[in-house]
């Protein structure tokens, strides 16, 4: 068994998709961890430059930067949200939604600190890993896969 990321288990196999995942899994986990290390608990502010607080702005910038590093076109919409676009050869559009804010960490973290993600027994654990930073990153990597395959 390989590493479990947000309910998906990457295994070595013959399929091209599994080979691609196996090749990029460490990078994907690194990027999920990078985003999950940001304590992006949403707070309301009067500052229009960071309407949900500095940490949420940092998470937005980190997500957009990751999209840009993958060759996509990121857009920041007045620090409220962002979009990461890729214009392929087709007129077909695919969209996915995610968020990078988290609820407060709370108590009871026994295996790690909430904003210091770790892999334990093949499972990535940390605040926001499954809701929703890991899911967002998994979708972004799926889009990267499609782009690299020439779709």
Q: Can you name each region flagged by the protein language model?
A:
Residues 4-15:
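Short, Lys/Arg-enriched N-terminal segments with co-localized hydrophobic residues
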Residues 4-5, 40, 75, 118:
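Generic low-complexity segments that are intrinsically disordered, proline-rich and/or Lys/Arg-biased
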Residues 11, 48, 135-137:
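N-terminal low-complexity, intrinsically disordered patches enriched in charged
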Residues 13-97, 102-106:
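N-terminal helical capping/dimerization or prosegment-like subdomains
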Residues 93-151:
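Active-site metal-coordination/substrate-binding segment of hydrolases
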